[in-house]
Amino acid sequence: MTQRVVSIVGPTASGKTGLGIAIARRLAEAGERAEIVNADAYQMYRGMDIGTAKPTAEEQAVVSHHLIDIIDPEDTMSVARFQQLARETIADLQSRGIRPILVGGSGLYARAAIDDITFPGTDPDVRTRLEEREKTEGAGALFDELRAKDPEAAARMDPRNPRRTIRALEVIELTGKPYSASLPRYRYVIPSVQIGLDLDRPDLDHRIDLRTKQMYDDGFIEEVERLRPHLGATAVRALGYQQIIDLLDGIWDVNDAFADIAQKTKRLARKQMGWFGRDPRIHWLQALNPKLVDNAMAIIAHADAGDYDSIDARADEYTQHHLGDITA
């Protein structure tokens, strides 16, 4: 029996934090230690609490959390850097007999921690040269070049997306290897089990509306006003922060700003469901089911026993043949 990393995924406002804490407490009742590893890209920034729905001090006191409040808003957190930090944290916890519970809505971040994903570097000069070629020769010419150099990658990409074509050619030039060799794989490098939280759209939209109102009540405007001089180019992209900056600048009134936050959060939630829905390894549970925690614990027990190994082993082949471009 292998103790798996538990990864809790799903759209924003679906209740991932609460489920992670509930699972950790249930494991503790059974005599097993568990701690939470954050996989939300923006909860890693200090001071960005209300806008990112960061676990409260009370929640963090119940179960130890890792990779929260680890960088300043002026700094940049890349997915490659997160991958290194997350894997180091997971290895440390496991070495001490503690089960990691990965919690977060950032799909690529959650996968980067446990999946076979590499992140080749970039070169601004190469990127600029390819972008200039796209302007003069056209996207079709660059895609034809990619098809000749890496047919597998070309077959899994949209020729109407020159940004990805340029990135693929950049990686080929920098690494001397096919771009397909660095594409994300639905293949665990750390034994894991993924539990997804699902809600009907009206229920999820209602939760998002309530959360947005709570952000206002909790002082989100004041949080952004305090952080504004320190928000770097990456941190300011967190949903909601730009709307409040525009509010402070008089571009929007309060109602319009928070209405836009709610609308864009709902759009993000649908995008997240599309991202996670591509992964056949995720075990989906109804977030509002009274037996949610019981069902999650049953899935973890089956995973530890190896009952899902054969399905997980075929996941990458399935996605490549049935879902096409897995870099979306």
Curated annotation (Swiss-Prot):
GO biological process: tRNA modification
Catalytic reactions of this protein: adenosine(37) in tRNA + dimethylallyl diphosphate = N(6)-dimethylallyladenosine(37) in tRNA + diphosphate
The keyword Metal-binding is assigned to this record: no
Binding site for ATP: G10, P11, T12, A13, S14, G15, K16, T17
Pfam families, per database record: IPPT
Matching HAMAP family: IPP_trans
Gene: miaA
Protein name: tRNA dimethylallyltransferase
InterPro entries associated with the record: Dimethylallyltransferase, IPT, P-loop_NTPase
Entry-linked Gene3D superfamilies: 1.10.20.140, P-loop containing nucleotide triphosphate hydrolases
Assembly: Monomer.
Family: Belongs to the IPP transferase family.
GO MF terms, alphabetically ordered: ATP binding; tRNA dimethylallyltransferase activity
